[in-house]
A protein has these predicted regions:
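Short, intrinsically disordered, mixed-charge
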Residues: 27-35, 96-99, 109-112
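Short, structured patches in soluble enzyme cores that scaffold and shape functional sites
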Residues: 18, 44, 96-98, 121-125
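Flexible glycine-rich active-site/ligand-binding loops centered on an Asp-His dyad
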Residues: 105-145
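Broad gene-expression machinery/nucleic-acid interaction feature
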Residues: 11, 37, 89-93, 104, ...
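Short, well-structured hydrophobic secondary-structure segments
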Residues: 17-74
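Mid-chain, well-packed structural core segment of small domains
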Residues: 64-108
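Generic N-terminal amphipathic, Lys/Arg-enriched alpha-helix
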Residues: 1-14
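Acidic/polar residues at beta-strand termini and the immediately following turn/coil
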Residues: 6, 68, 84, 132-140
Length: 145
C-alpha cells in the first residue's frame, strides 16, 4: 500500500447527450483543462461500451475477459484520472443495467451515450502521481513520486 494526501481543486459538471462518445469526450475535457489527477462519478445511460468483466483466472498478469454491451443501459460508475507521460489514463468501473440484468465491469472503449450521461469530475491538488505501465501486472498502475 502507498498513499498521498491532497485536496479537492476544481470541480467540473459535465453533460453528455444522446449519441456522444463518452470516453473520447472525457479525454478531451481532461486534456483541455489539464486535469492531471482526478476522480469522477458517472450517472445516466450508455447504449454501447466495450468492457472487461474481470480476469480469466486470478493470476499476474491477468488475461482480461472482454464483453460488448449493446442496447440501453442505466449506468452508474466511478473512476480515476492519472497520466502516463503525455497521455491521460482513465480507470472506470461501472454497473450497467437493463430490466434487472446488471453487469459490473471496467469500461475500456467504444462508449456511446444513451439519452444523457452526467459526470462530475473532482480535480485532486497537492499530490504527484502518475499511471505508468506496470509490466509485472500487465496494466497501468497508480504510482506516487
Amino acid at each position: 500500500m502507498d498513499y498521498r494526501k491532497g485536496a479537492i481543486g476544481r470541480v467540473f459538471a459535465v453533460r453528455f447527450d444522446e449519441g456522444d462518445l463518452f470516453l473520447e469526450g472525457l479525454l478531451e475535457i481532461i486534456t483541455e483543462e489539464k486535469i492531471t489527477n482526478g476522480w469522477f462519478h458517472v450517472l445516466g445511460g450508455l447504449r454501447e461500451a466495450d468492457v472487461v468483466t474481470g480476469p480469466k483466472e486470478p493470476v499476474m498478469p491477468p488475461e482480461p475477459v472482454w464483453n460488448e454491451v449493446r442496447g440501453a443501459r442505466e449506468t452508474m460508475g466511478t473512476g480515476s484520472i492519472f497520466w502516463d507521460g503525455n497521455e491521460p489514463k482513465i480507470h472506470l468501473h461501472a454497473a450497467m443495467g437493463h430490466h434487472g440484468d446488471t453487469l459490473t465491469a471496467c469500461v475500456r472503449k467504444g462508449t456511446k451515450v444513451y439519452l444523457v450521461l452526467e459526470v462530475v469530475i473532482f480535480e485532486i491538488d497537492g499530490i504527484h502521481a502518475s499511471r505508468p505501465w506496470y509490466a509485472e501486472g500487465g496494466f497501468n498502475r497508480l504510482t506516487f513520486s
